Amino acid sequence: MSKPVLQIQKLTKTYMLGKRPVQALTDVNLQVNEGEFVAIMGSSGSGKTTLLNVIGCIDKASTGQVLLDGIDVSKMPENQLYKIRRDKMGFIFQTFNLLPYLNARENVELPMEGKIKSKADRKKRASELLTIVGLSGRENHRPQRLSAGEQQRVAIARALANDPAIILADEPTGNLDTKNKHEIIKVLAHLNLTRGTTIIMVTHDNQAANHTERMLLLKDGRIVKEKEGLHLAKKNHKCPHCGSSIALKDDMCPSCKMPLYASEEIFSS
């Protein structure tokens, strides 16, 4: 059985708006196991990004406990949290945040500088990661010479740089056109299927969410619904519609011709 990578218990987060307290998260309980691909959905202001920031040790909970890879980060001081962020987490954002004066490989190398002393080893690993995300031959291109989809692939490779316990993706397809959205979500799903990469993704996109195996709906700072995603069918190599065998590369069942990822509304209001 997979071990828990993330355990959250009775988490709350309160901000002060002037003198008025605003509850962003209320009594959140969540466990994510090693190798899971989980989507967090919800309307603007529901608490999605706040939850991701707390998980990512960018913000601290007001009350409750957060265990990351067995380590309690809830009360950890900042001088220790930066090592947790560097060693245990990979971050992917809606904006790619690539340094324009560095090429693709150098951008991927940056997070490794505190962990891998050899420049040659960093260069080799960065090149390997860029190949994994489909950018072989583009290593020496600077961001301005890459398409938006390619820049996000570089950001994904950078997130994998230190072999993190978990990837946190905040609207990773938000700045992309339809074609690139589909390609990027397929890259993430492929990493999860083939490498067992644990991913938590915040998204508004129904099709992107259905590439995960578990979808959570956040409303007014609480997890109110949970639903199984179609990605789980691929892990089981079984079509959710007719039960026929499917391969990892399939987007449509070869037997019943039904799509393996849907784009319709997941959580009805």
Regions found by a protein language model. Give the residues of each.
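Flanking scaffold residues of small Cys/His-coordinated metal-binding clusters
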Residues: K3, K234, L248
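ABC family nucleotide-binding domain
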Residues: P4-L6, L11-L218
